Amino acid sequence: MANSDSAVLLNLYVQVAPADLFRLLQRQSGRIVRNGIYSARLVIWMMMNQRLQAGGTLARSVEQLVQGRFSPLLSRCKRVKEMRIGLSTGGYCQARQNLPKLLVSQTVNELIERLRQRMGKPTMEGQPRVYVLDGSSLQVEYSAELVKAYPQAQNRHGKSHRPVVRIVVLHDVDTGLAERPYWGPMYGPRAVSEQALGEQATKHVPAGSVIIGDRNFGIFSVAYHAQQQGHGTIVRLTAVRARKLVGGEISGAMDQPVQWRTSRWDGKKNRTWPADASVPGRLIAQQVGRGKHKQWLYLFTTLALPAEQIVACYGKHWRIETDLRSLKQTVRLQQLSVQSADMMEKELLVAVLAYNLVRTIMYLAAQRSGGDPRQLSFTYACNIVLDGYPTILAARGAKQQEQELNSIIDLVARCKLPKRKKRRSYPRGIWGRGFRFPIRKEEKTK
């Protein structure tokens, strides 16, 4: 990420994360607040800065600290006043490890709400938030602790090398803000499903929100728990499940009231609802697409909106695919270089917070230009925001800083994605990774 982009992000972080907030959260978590170089406020920012930089290392973050890049976040301890901040990464590394996970979690929850308020999108009655629910998987470094917590994938050829983490995130359809993620092991005896993680995620969004899910979440348990939590749902169903719901074949477009009743297969041993549980709603069947790409779309919804609006709302589901791509590639969540489960969870939370900071700048830029924040490039915006860091820090006074911030926001507003006149004529595809080295086999003990 460029320096100007970093400046804008730092300025926004300073505004939404004042030192008083961290002192309050630390006292609430029972931590003793010490006046040292690596305060919780500074450490969380340095971890975010690492996530947003292509070559983000501990050494690079400490170098930026010594050069004065993070001066607004430094406490006035003795070593800071004497300008005696060492280049060794040991102090920063220990500060990251000693950072309480509860404090990071509370900070993420608080800052997400503050960013939403900064966008001018507070929770309002009559205007429900619309979220897209989706899941993915992440890889982490091999270590005994991580392998025990998150077992590797396994097939007839043996086990994979890296532990795998399953993650589920709710993304705001309009702003692109990600809520706090939920995760668990993808394999092994304690493996958790995306649906179970999704039920945890929907518990922590305001009642009355609308949850959009693809066919993976088009099952009874997701609809039932969303109803119990006071949420509206729009979930896609498989053709088999749709036919079962209406009790017969579906020969054409339809919009029919249905009563989704639980079956003996739903939940199996993990069932947490009564045997006669049901969810009232509507089944909408429509053909979508063009020419030979036409296909049937089956949606179950508890909303009272017209069928055309329901289909259009579900059409926004694709946005989470680009959001997850930004999280895994630009914010570098695809593979986490950590050695402990505790550190993995903190890095995951901080990465989502860094992503939300960039999304906030993009939303503010779109507001100023009167455009759609979804038409801006996340990677371009991220680079511009980091490039503006020295400019804002060099500004004298709050007024000049605000002017520099506005100039960067205006620049971000120009990072528009290209408008294609027609769809690409070739099928989308990627080359497989292949095997660079022979598969390692375990020697059998005699």
Predicted regions and their residues:
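Noncatalytic, basic helical substrate-engagement surface that gates or grips nucleic-acid strands
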Residues: 88, 132-133
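Generic beta-strand or strand-like secondary-structure segments
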Residues: 64, 91-94, 110
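Single, function-defining residue in the core of a domain
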Residues: 1-60, 98-99, 106-110, 125-129, ...
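DNA-recognition alpha helix
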Residues: 57-81
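A short, well-structured juxtamembrane/interface segment
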Residues: 113-121
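Major-groove recognition helix of helix-turn-helix-like DNA-binding domains
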Residues: 75-101
